[in-house]
Amino acid sequence: MKQLLVIIKPFQATAVLDLVAQHEVEACFVDEVKGYGRQKNNLEQYRGSEYNLAFLPKVEITIWAEDEIAEKLAKEIAQVAHTGLMGDGKIFMTDAAWPEAMEF
């Protein structure tokens, strides 16, 4: 089992989630987050507002999937979300056991 933590630009979320829906994953969660990568301390226009790149809005998608599916999905997400511009995003893949959860 692998956990994918995908950080992308908000406008790419629909395309990435459509791709995730085509694969058998154990779970998928989506959050709106802010943060920075290597581009910190630069100003950029985003939807008519100026942002310090240290805290641009992003979408975080957390996915749990079997190893083979996760590897394939990570490559496909990278292709779909890539624009070639700074701040496209990151994909972190870690080994994970399915956590014990209390369902209610």
What spans do the regions from the language model cover?
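Positively charged, small/polar-rich N-terminal and surface patches that mediate targeting and assembly
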Residues: 1-104
